[in-house]
Amino acid sequence: MIKSQKEYLERIEYLNTLSHHYYNLDDSIVSDAVYDELYQELKAYEGKNPNSIQANSPTQKVGATTPNSFNKNPHLMRMWSLDDVFNQSELQAWLQRILKAYPSASFVCSPKLDGVSLNLLYQHGKLVKATTRGNGLEGELVSANAKHIANIPHAIAYNGEIEIRGEVIISKKDFDALNKERLNANEPLFANPRNAASGSLRQLDSEITKKRKLQFIPWGVGKHSLNFISFKECLDFIVSLGFSAIQYLSLNKNHQEIEENYHTLIKEREGFFALLDGMVIVVNELNIQKELGYTQKSPKFACAYKFPALEKHTKIVGIINQVGRSGAITPVAVLEPVEIAGAIITKATLHNYSEIEKKNIMLNDRVVVIRSGDVIPKIIKPLESYRDGSQHKIERPKVCPICSHELLCEEIFTYCQNLNCPARLKESLIHFASKDALNIQGLGDKVIEQLFEEKLIFNALDLYALKLEDLMRLDKFKIKKAQNLLDAIQKSKNPPLWRLINALGIEHIGKGASKTLARYGLNVLEKSEAEFLEMEGFGVEMARSLVNFYASNQEFIRSLFDLLNPKNSDMAEEKQESSSVFSNKTIVLTGTLSKPRQEYAQMLENLGAKISSSVSAKTDFLIVGENAGSKLALAKKHGVSVLNEEELLKRLKEFD
């Protein structure tokens, strides 16, 4: 449950990180079930707080940004994502919204294959391009690799321009064989068939793709000029062109028939040749589809009825406390080994101690564990009926398991605030050098990783002791690059006070709070909890975090301040914000722009703007790209100033 705007923003950042790993790195950090749960909580918060919706929320976009390994290619028609439903009541509500307006509507149901979406463009009967989904508007051009997928026709008996879309998958049998080969070759194993399919499709060497035995299962079309009446007719036409037929495809008239087909699929799931994670439901009548239309992210005429995640019962025999990059302590349960979906599970995350307490999970409990193709399984609940008196309460740790410093215990999370804790040093330094902190050019996460590996740095102070010969030891560092980095590090001295405060990475203290603190002078961090509470916008958690952080890191902070000699203000930056035409203005971005909306949103926020996702009478500017839609009409109704992309760029250039 998301309770505050801060938690909401953190959830967006976390889900976007998961999406990046899932879509671009072929790495499922969490299970689909865990992601879905976190995503639904985000949607629920946005439903109650529509004016707070952020442009970079995963509810507002499809997939993830396209990586740089392959050339980008636009889709002729957008590739949409599907909304999920998880139970009978949610499905009933979705169906009722459609059947109330269109009582005669019917529904095509088909297995939801867990693979990689691919868009095939045919012109004059020839396959000319194959593009991954990407962000829905553009994806990676993988034509050479797609032509090595055996069941993708290189030519079809239709000369018009048509986009045929489907899922690239690897069968369970071929996945197992592939992982055995990789094991024998001492290569990293794929976590699941979806990751294997994605990694195989995106190989730079097409011969590797050819060996992976990928398959393409069609599920729809994009741009075309054919006059289909129904979705089923469209799918039949695709099969007639030589594509593989969809197994267990059915046409249904009501909720009961859909539920029957859903449960049939669940029964067939284990024996199905490929990995399934649900059932796709699509309105069959194309005229009804057109009238229902789309949300910002997904069609209103289709949904994915998700399967329950695979689960098993086992026993918790121990607890390991792991320290994350932010200092957050994550309890991990040590389990009696249990096999789930072909993998032996010995550990499962418990997320945080608040969740342990809420679920009343105890040491030696028998518990329900789920795993849906992910690496780290999740404990759902304890089986209290199995308790025999040997169970013990799982206590929150009081000191860090790595550095033994006293922990900051909040209602939900527990943190190690020691900046010198080895488990969080690397991430602390990445934040220290970031754009909103000391903005040290050239000091990214890969460089910091190398510096740690070479034992050249252990904390921020060590950065300023680096020498040219130290940096020359790093991979790909020549004299010029090394000297540029040394110059950038030295240039970061004498920063505005707020930047140095923000660079410390104090829990609950971001850019805005750092600017407020900076107004109180160089000794601001020495103040008491009561004094912090008197500051505008500061609550108990922020005040306690500041007090505890300073108590744990006094010597380090003083040394850092002495070395960097921060300025008490930064009038240049403040003047730029306050003089900006966008300062304190509410801005909405809509339509297709040449750059990602989030990139423009960041530029505008740096000039003091507030970014919103919905137009109202309180909106000051609407930035419009192509296909602006209803927001443009609403802006005109409310008398909102409208800027196109060219006008926006002209105004932004004034502040370069």
UniProtKB/Swiss-Prot annotation:
Residues 577-656 form the BRCT domain. Gene3D superfamilies: 5' to 3' exonuclease, C-terminal subdomain (1.10.150.20), BRCT domain (3.40.50.10190), DNA ligase/mRNA capping enzyme (3.30.470.30), Helix hairpin bin (1.10.287.610), Nucleic acid-binding proteins (2.40.50.140). It catalyses: NAD(+) + (deoxyribonucleotide)n-3'-hydroxyl + 5'-phospho-(deoxyribonucleotide)m = (deoxyribonucleotide)n+m + AMP + beta-nicotinamide D-nucleotide. It is an enzyme of class 6 (ligase). InterPro entries: BRCT_dom, BRCT_dom_sf, DNA_ligase, DNA_ligase_AS, DNA_ligase_CS, DNAligase_adenylation, DNAligase_N, Hlx-hairpin-Hlx_DNA-bd_motif. The active site is at 112 (n6-amp-lysine intermediate). Its cofactor is Mg(2+); Mn(2+). This is DNA ligase. GO terms for molecular function: DNA binding; DNA ligase (NAD+) activity; metal ion binding. Keywords: DNA damage, DNA repair, DNA replication, Ligase, Magnesium, Manganese, Metal-binding, NAD, Zinc. Zn(2+) binds at residues 400, 403, 416, 421. The lineage of its organism: Bacteria, Pseudomonadati, Campylobacterota, Epsilonproteobacteria, Campylobacterales.
